[in-house]
Design a protein with these regions (language model features):
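Central beta-strand plus flanking loop segment that forms part of the substrate or channel wall
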Residues: 1-7, 63, 256
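Conserved FAD-binding catalytic core of PHBH/FMO-like flavoproteins
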Residues: 2-37
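Short, glycine-/Ser/Thr-/acidic-enriched flexible segments
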Residues: 3, 27, 36-37, 103, ...
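Short beta-strand-initiation
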Residues: 8, 15-17, 83-84, 93, ...
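C-terminal catalytic lobe of FAD-dependent flavoproteins
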Residues: 17, 26, 47-188
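Pocket-edge structural micro-motifs
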Residues: 24, 31-35, 82, 99-100, ...
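Glycine-rich phosphate/pyrophosphate-binding loop
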Residues: 32, 37-56
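Glycine/proline-enriched, intrinsically flexible loops and inter-domain linkers
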Residues: 139-140, 144-287
Length: 287
């Protein structure tokens, strides 16, 4: 409803601590939110659903509304004439989906833009067009390549849990090395329990729980986020020294495995790899 002094050209305001944003809307104020935990919409989507809204949800919006009224006291008395509630697409890692699908050649995707579609449209459109015309990525676009997800990410339970976290990351601190908190323990190594018993602090890569570092000297195996040197630094240094000066064992369960067969397999690998691959059967080569 109208608020004294409000007008269309009011600057957009954002309060990441309160997870809200607001701007002028005529002679009123529009209030929105990127809540830390959003509400997944996983009901069957009608085939003809496009640019439509769903029902009001004042209960879910109660916290952002209270935060908005604290930030803009005039909202206490003005009220709201309209509640706009519609679904938005978010991906499991907060990066959009682009490129040719692995299941069907010549089918290209540009979707899941995580509320930054307008801001990303120019660059995404250009590089996708060049990708289609040229037949390959014009630059390194692996972080948004649709092929980066495996079957584990096409699971409703996984998506429901992870999507609730992703939206809120827009207004959370972008810590270096931040790990997702939801939809964890999807894919575990046979050694997972033994690694955990040795103090492993796990991160997730392609759904696999993999040790990032091992806690030492009674410390907790939990990441303490910082823009400076983080709490794992000395632990990592000890592991590095052990690998250089003594011996280390690596669990490579979570790494991809490719099998190359055929008469020219060795020649191709010798060309691709930096190390000598021509070794007897049963040996391994680090390259």
């Amino acid at each position: 409803k109208p608020i004294d002094g409000a007008f269309d050209e009011l600057p957009v305001g954002r309060d990441p601590d309160l997870c809200i944003y607001f701007r002028g809307e005529g002679n009123a104020v529009m209030l929105g939110a990127f809540q830390a935990r959003s509400k997944p919409w996983d009901v069957p989507v009608p085939d003809d659903f496009a640019f439509q809204l769903i029902g009001d949800d004042w209960e879910k919006f109660a916290e952002p509304l209270a935060n908005g009224q604290w930030r803009i006291p005039a909202l206490h008395s003005s009220g709201f004439e309209r509640f706009v509630n519609g679904p938005e697409s978010f991906t499991p890692d907060n990066n959009f989906l682009m490129g040719e699908t692995p299941e069907l050649r010549s089918l290209f995707v540009a979707a899941g833009f995580n509320s930054v579609g307008i801001a990303s449209a120019g660059g995404a459109g250009r590089y996708l067009a060049e990708w289609i015309i040229g037949g390959h990525m014009p630059i390194d676009l692996w972080s948004v390549d649709v092929r980066r997800f495996g079957a584990y990410a096409n699971n409703t339970a996984f998506l429901r849990e992870r999507s609730a976290e992703i939206l809120g990351l827009h207004y959370q601190m972008a810590w270096p090395n931040r790990e997702f908190e939801t939809a964890r323990n999807i894919r575990l190594s046979p050694l997972h329990d033994r690694l955990a018993a040795q103090g492993a602090s796990f991160g997730v890569k392609a759904g696999w729980e993999r040790p990032n570092w091992f806690a030492r000297d009674g410390m907790r195996a939990e990441m303490e986020y910082s823009f400076g040197r983080q709490n794992w630094f000395e632990c990592h240094a000890a592991e590095h020294r052990a690998a250089r000066e003594a011996v280390a064992v690596f669990d490579q369960t979570g790494f991809g495995k490719l099998e190359l067969r055929g008469r020219d397999a060795l020649a191709v690998l010798q060309r691709l790899c930096g190390n000598n691959i021509d070794v007897p059967v049963g040996h391994g080569v680090y390259t």
